[in-house]
């Protein structure tokens, strides 16, 4: 199972709660970023297995970040998160190249692991 994670989200409280949830369930959070450009830099520098990526960021949306990260193919697996429902984004999730989508209120290590299998 992929183990290392970078969390990209502009809300410090969500980053802290996501870190606590994932680390309690065996994931290792190796980095965090508060916007898309910092997230791309962190992902390239830290080379995590998984990126937990908020759809709504201050400088660019998560779909653009995902496309940028997927340019080289291969890892990391990108999982989009949002406080909104997946249906609100239409086909953008599928078009982004992300491994999947998890509503923020459903985030858990098991949910993430199931999506990565």
What are these model-derived regions, one by one?
Residues 12-31:
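Two-component/phosphorelay signaling modules centered on CheY-like receiver
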Residues 35-38, 61-64:
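Acidic catalytic/metal-coordinating carboxylates
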């Amino acid at each position: 199972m992929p183990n290392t994670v970078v969390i990209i989200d502009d809300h410090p409280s969500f980053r802290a709660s996501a870190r606590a949830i994932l680390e309690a369930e065996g994931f290792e959070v190796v980095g965090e970023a508060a916007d898309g450009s910092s997230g791309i830099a962190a992902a390239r520098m830290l080379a995590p297995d998984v990126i937990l990526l908020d759809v709504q960021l201050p400088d660019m949306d998560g779909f653009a970040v995902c496309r940028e990260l997927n340019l080289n193919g291969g890892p990391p697996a990108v999982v989009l998160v949002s406080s909104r429902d997946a249906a609100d984004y239409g086909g953008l999730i599928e078009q982004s190249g992300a491994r999947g989508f998890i509503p923020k209120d459903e985030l858990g290590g098991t949910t993430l692991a199931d999506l990565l299998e």
